[in-house]
């Protein structure tokens, strides 16, 4: 997989929709699909505007790498500001460290810690370590 992933000290941004199953029931399949597409558009726009590189996405969650912590924080703030106008609430976590970079992405404790930080948040929050 060929991407320009940052190396050395990296700030990870993890995102996840809060209550996605409940939201699916409330909006219905078509409404949820439209909201999810808008959520992805908003997040990807914020990531790219602030130097982020999408590492992975699963369902409604993203893992994004940034070469700088300020860029990651600006992306998270911009995304949350825009998302606040819609039905989807997203929890986000930022964690900085020195992961091991492989041909397929990142491995290391820093990645696991970042995921745990994001998982403790609530929709609309950005947690920092």
Indicate where each model-derived feature is located.
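Catalytic beta-strand-to-alpha-helix segment of the class III nucleotidyl cyclase homology domain
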Residues: 3, 44, 63-129
